[in-house]
Curated annotation (Swiss-Prot):
This is Polyamine aminopropyltransferase. Its EC number is 2.5.1.16. It is found in: Cytoplasm. It holds the Pfam family Spermine_synth. S-methyl-5'-thioadenosine binds at residues 36, 111, 143-144, 169. Gene3D superfamilies: Spermidine synthase, tetramerisation domain, Vaccinia Virus protein VP39. It comes from the Bacteria. It catalyses: S-adenosyl 3-(methylsulfanyl)propylamine + putrescine = S-methyl-5'-thioadenosine + spermidine + H(+). Catalyzes the irreversible transfer of a propylamine group from the amino donor S-adenosylmethioninamine (decarboxy-AdoMet) to putrescine (1,4-diaminobutane) to yield spermidine. One of its GO terms (cellular component) is cytoplasm. Homodimer or homotetramer. Spermidine binds at residues 67, 91.
């Protein structure tokens, strides 16, 4: 289990199953919203960062490892990208990356906790960048689970889930009913993607998620990458589609438009990241 961030001297630590992950720095904000405990820190190594209920979420100088991995395999492969849904993502990083594509005409972001948005805009403005003022961006402070349940069939070209760990307000982002609705509201030729935890620190959660998403969508595969401040540093994102594993192949014109401005993602990186699945994970997924 993960416990509250612990400060010892100048260190802010996240504890998880006998292991701790820490950054040297200082706490800027510590408050409890109606949904969760929110901590904003200023670290020496990664700049300002955000924790929710004691879990590291993002930081200025390493957030691209996460946001680029979630967004670009989906946006570079979906048949169309005019209408995008982001569930969660209150720091703005996922929306920022999506809005780099001129083909995105309308982006809905549904974040349950308005204080995450407020504090991210105040303390972490570089992560959201200009997304907050983009006319294509539409923010709703509300329940993303309910939004997915109430949305029309085949309404979105891309659905991205940028949620926290499966506890507290994000717990419902990991179950059959939610993923079924995400599948239902995805257009033909669309791509779904979600962060799917660490195959080391959250091994069973990761395996169960990939299996369930594959069952519901028909095609799903995990992509593996590195997020330095997350438990074990080894993280995953799972991509799914209903017609074919289209997320494995990028559309070259879209890729060329965003690759130069990306710090982590490239078509070559993506190909390698999909192919780094460890044998023990592949065996368990195929059981």
């Amino acid at each position: 289990m993960t416990t509250a961030p612990e400060t010892s001297g100048n260190w802010i630590d996240e504890h998880h199953n006998g292991v701790r992950y820490g950054l040297e720095g200082r706490v800027l904000v510590e408050e409890t919203s109606p949904f969760q405990r929110i901590t904003v820190i200023d670290s020496q190594r990664y700049g300002k960062g955000l924790l929710l209920d004691g879990c590291w979420m993002t930081a200025e100088h390493q957030e691209r490892h996460y946001h680029e991995a979630l967004v670009h395999p989906a946006l570079c492969s979906a048949k169309a990208i005019e209408r995008v849904l982001v569930i969660g993502g209150g720091d703005g990083g996922t929306a920022r990356e999506c809005l780099r594509y001129p083909g995105v005409k309308h982006l809905d972001m549904v974040e349950i906790d308005g204080r995450v948005v407020d504090l991210s805009q105040e303390h972490l403005p570089s992560i959201g960048g200009g997304c907050w003022h983009d006319p294509r961006f539409h923010l709703t402070i509300g329940d993303g689970i309910a939004w997915a349940a109430e949305a029309e069939n085949a309404f979105y070209d891309v659905v991205l889930v940028d949620g926290s760990d499966p506890t507290g307000p994000a717990e419902g982002l990991f179950n059959r009913a939610f993923f079924s609705n995400c599948c239902r509201i995805l257009k033909p030729g669309g791509v779904f993607a979600t962060q799917s935890e660490s195959p080391e620190a959250f091994r069973q959660v990761h395996i169960d998620m990939v299996k369930l998403i594959r069952e519901l969508f028909g095609h799903a595969d995990p992509l593996y990458g590195w997020v330095p401040m997350y438990p074990s540093g080894w993280w995953s994102w799972t991509f799914a589609a209903k017609d074919a594993p289209r997320y494995l192949t990028v559309q070259s014109e879209r890729a060329a438009a965003v690759a130069e401005g990306s710090a982590i993602w490239s078509p070559r990186w993506q190909q390698g990241a999909f192919n780094t699945i460890p044998a023990f994970i592949e065996r368990e997924l195929n059981q």
